[in-house]
């Protein structure tokens, strides 16, 4: 979990690649904790924090080249503060209450 929560997350992940290579440790998959989705102190699904991971496409490709599948942690809700919340609400894509409003409950970082 510490890798994607670090401010220099991408750099730490590449160090991980180097370390397993140096120690000849086999690795076919890596679970990315939700730090890669961070906006401020919040975790916002389907969002790459480009301060931590400036080039996510290259990052994913580099791991794939090494035979490592990245498995991203995806939270089961969009926070009401998520940048795409209003757009998704407008499209009617949320689970709804009986009155037609999006179902909202408490999650780790806020309501979603």
Predicted region positions:
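Aromatic-lined carbohydrate-binding/catalytic grooves of carbohydrate-active enzymes
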Residues: 1-112
């Amino acid at each position: 979990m510490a890798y994607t929560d670090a401010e220099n997350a991408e750099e730490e992940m590449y160090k991980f690649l180097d370390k397993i290579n140096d120690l000849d440790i086999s690795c076919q998959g890596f679970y990315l904790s939700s730090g890669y989705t961070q906006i401020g102190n919040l975790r916002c699904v389907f969002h790459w924090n480009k301060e931590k991971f400036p080039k996510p496409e290259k990052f994913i490709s580099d791991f794939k080249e090494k035979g490592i599948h990245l498995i991203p942690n995806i939270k089961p809700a969009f926070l009401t503060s998520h940048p795409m919340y209003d757009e998704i609400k407008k499209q009617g894509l949320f689970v709804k209450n009986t009155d037609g409003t999006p179902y909202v409950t408490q999650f780790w970082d806020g309501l979603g």
